[in-house]
Amino acid sequence: MSKVLEQVEAIVTPITDELQLELVDIAFEKEGPNWFLRIFIDKDGGVDIDECAAVSEKVSEKMDENDPITQNYFLEVSSPGAERPLKKEQDFENAVSKYVHVTSYEPIDGRKMWEGTLVSYDGTTLVITITDKTRKITCEIPKDKVAKARLAIQF
């Protein structure tokens, strides 16, 4: 995480903690000529628009006092959605028995992408059951080889 995002996280975390919300992720991205600071929040049962607005107002006030971002940007606060990213240890633990999408930095047994049920996670290894054509395969993926992971919607 960049130094700027770490500073933003230090500003946002007390706000989400106060409102009993989980800070899922922070992204600072350029789209066309515009920059966006995106803050993703959640809680059991999901967040509503009023909670997103409350976080947005409080973060905006704090960022006006001491903003680590020098250029102009748009602030967006939202839910991570149904395909929320898995980043923290707790995210992976909570995703056990759920359908996930995982990519790796390098091929593991000839694959760099898996989509299936996360059977277990022990802190170092993800065990995923995938369907390859008509057969089920169990794959072990070392956590340190995971480039990205998220919940996925199964069709």
Swiss-Prot record:
Alphabetic keyword roster: Cytoplasm, Ribosome biogenesis
Biological processes annotated in GO: ribosomal small subunit assembly; translation
Keyword check for Zinc-finger: no
Residues annotated as signal peptide: none
Pfam families noted in UniProt: DUF150_C, RimP_N
GO CC, one annotated term: cytosol
UniProt-annotated location(s): Cytoplasm
Family according to the record: Belongs to the RimP family.
Function (record text): Required for maturation of 30S ribosomal subunits.
The name this protein goes by in its record: Ribosome maturation factor RimP
Gene responsible for this protein: rimP
